[in-house]
Regions:
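Generic N-terminal leader/processing signal
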Residues: 1, 5, 14-20, 26-28, ...
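N-terminal capping/linker segments that flank leucine-rich repeat
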Residues: 1-51, 198, 204-222
């Protein structure tokens, strides 16, 4: 398909979106064909939907006020200091790491990103963080905090959690067989889910004693 035809398709689809997103079609076209991008275009006020776009990287200085959808995009790296005001969707990504200074105001969804090995110390996850089935993940940063829920289910190579881990919502550790204990100072603002894991060897009281001076606000599901 000719480049002109692809651009016309982008432009046509963009006309059907809300006015606040009207410049994003041009940005998507430039990203797809690796064209130069202005500073103004790097500041996206609304959502930026790049789902399925065959790109491997994003430009430095990109800021998205709404959601950034990169599912099925073949993305291999993200720029340092990337800021997303809404959700950052990276389901089934090929990312091996995340950049320093990444800030996500909504949900950071990395479900099934099986090449991801670690998270940066400077990551700010203000909403939910979905790391379910990130099978290469081996650790979390010391003093890590998640504003919402944290899903670590099916993270088979995760063998420990850092002391002082804070989770604003519920914590899922279903079938994370590598975990044989929980750290001191763990705080969970919601419930704890340990179904089909080695943590079911401990009683509820033993788990709550194990994490002191930490605390689990909700129930423990086993």
């Amino acid at each position: 398909m000719k480049k002109e035809t692809l651009k016309n398709i982008f432009d046509f689809l963009e006309e059907k979106e809300n006015k606040k997103h009207k410049d994003n079609g041009s940005l998507k076209w430039k990203l797809f064909f690796n064209k130069s991008i202005t500073k103004e275009e790097l500041n996206v006020n609304g959502d930026l939907n790049l789902r399925g776009l065959k790109i491997k990287s994003l430009p430095e200085g990109l800021k998205v006020g709404g959601n950034l959808d990169l599912k099925e995009s073949e993305i291999q790296s993200l720029p340092e200091g990337l800021k997303v005001g809404g959700d950052l969707i990276l389901i089934d990504s090929k990312l091996k790491s995340l950049p320093e200074g990444l800030k996500v105001g909504g949900e950071l969804d990395l479900y099934w990103s099986r090449e991801l090995t670690s998270l940066p110390k400077t990551l700010k996850a203000e909403g939910d963080l979905n790391l379910g089935t990130c099978t290469s993940l081996t650790s979390l940063p010391k003093g890590f905090k998640v504003g919402g829920r944290l899903n670590l289910s099916h993270c088979e190579n995760l063998t420990s959690l850092p002391e002082g881990l804070e989770v604003g919502g519920s914590l899922w550790l279903i079938e994370s067989w590598g975990l044989k204990s929980l750290p001191k100072g763990l705080y969970v603002g919601g419930s704890l889910h340990i179904q089909r894991s080695n943590l079911t060897n401990f009683s509820d009281d033993e788990i709550r004693d194990m994490i002191k001076p930490g605390f689990i606000e909700g129930k423990i599901y086993r």
